[in-house]
Amino acid sequence: TTFRGQPLGNRPEAALKTCVMSATAPDMFSAAQFERFDALRAACGDLGYGADAYAYGLVALGTVGVVAEASMNPWDFMALIPVIEGAGGRVTDWAGEPLTLESDGTVLAAATPALHQAALHILND
């Protein structure tokens, strides 16, 4: 993935405690999902709400480390996958499965595979 002809790179950071996390809004989660989301939020350095799709672009840039969302539709996330993965990041559902048209609506995007793995561990602990 490139921006103005330059390859996008992600941050080398692999620690959730120092990364910025983003989500559209806290009301996008069911009660059970919010408990899992809140555990991940507590492990991250900072949280921002309201960036919507812009947050995924920031994941590709490496400015945001993790985006965790729910209640998503395929048109919300499918076009973002190649951008993030092309920049070296990873995007799956909360179970770590590839996103498809039949996915459950949960999305976990991370700037690095290490951040993604750490976030998955917390979401599924």
Regions found by a protein language model. Give the residues of each.
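An extended, acidic
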Residues: G9-D125
